[in-house]
Amino acid sequence: MWFKNLTLYRFNKPFAVETEALETALADFTFSPCSSQDVSKFGFSNALGKKGSSLVHSADNRHLICVTKEEKILPGQVIKEALEEKVALIEDEENRKMAKKEKDALKDEIITSLLPRAFSRRSQTHALILPELEMILVDSSSATKAEELLALLRKALGSLPVIPLSFKAPVESNLTEWLKLGSAPLPFEMQDEAELKSEADEGGIVRFKQQDLKEDEVLAHLATGKQVHKLALHFGQSIALLLQSDASVKRLKFSEEFRAGNDEVGTDDPMARLDADFALMGSELVALMHALVAALGGLEEAQV
């Protein structure tokens, strides 16, 4: 359940859906496994996984939701070879060239015949709805997966006025300034990894890892006009992260010491531990968002 990435969105209007109403809305779009002829299925599932019993898990007016996606695995090469074999057979028997429309229809038939025997894979994406911040945090490094979750949530609720998080000043401008100064605003602490990009169309990209970012070798790239687009940070003693210029957070990791705060909770009750972990994670992510917005100079004014 501990989030590992953050794709960030904000509401244009206050989110005022209560837990019970949210649960009811999601219930019409619950996940069900693929049938023999389904290519994929997508829907809401228990927020706390197999041990959970509800689509929404809430604490302190913070709501955790989860979507599950199942996809049939049909390798393109398998389809291509089957199609070529079938086309060659028909063209040889009928002594003619098949039209593109016929080949497309034949391809659909082949896919239909292969689906019942295809393996499938499942993936899950969680999101945290934070009415107090008017934000949604999606635990995904993929903007596409985040948008899929939001699209289904929008369908369930009827509307979902959200936009990607954006700041008054470009994130890369702030990251570049921090690197020049040799430190990030408290409670953030700069680590030993960064990615710098030239603003020129065909400019270069330089990556530093396990290196002192205050060294002249690093700062020299700033003098040539490069800007920082990725920067590794620590948030206090609780979270390590990689902040990117698109305002997304990658490689989010809660420290063992921080997570150990719940070690004595739920030793005999796994649900109690999950509930405690969610409350702990939620409160720290709220603190992280407050600090991040302040460090980056505030959010851009929302367009209603």
From Swiss-Prot:
Main location (coarse class): cytoplasm
Pfam families named in the record: RdgC (PF04381)
GO cellular component: bacterial nucleoid; cytoplasm
Subcellular location: Cytoplasm, Nucleoid
Keyword Nuclease belongs to the record: no
GO MF term list: double-stranded DNA binding
Annotated keywords: Cytoplasm, DNA recombination
Gene Ontology biological-process annotations: DNA recombination; regulation of DNA recombination
InterPro entries: RdgC (IPR007476)
Sequence similarity: Belongs to the RdgC family.
Protein's job: May be involved in recombination.
Protein name per Swiss-Prot or TrEMBL: Recombination-associated protein RdgC
Origin species: Shewanella baltica (strain OS155 / ATCC BAA-1091)
Lineage, highest ranks first: Bacteria, Pseudomonadati, Pseudomonadota, Gammaproteobacteria, Alteromonadales
Gene designation per UniProt: rdgC
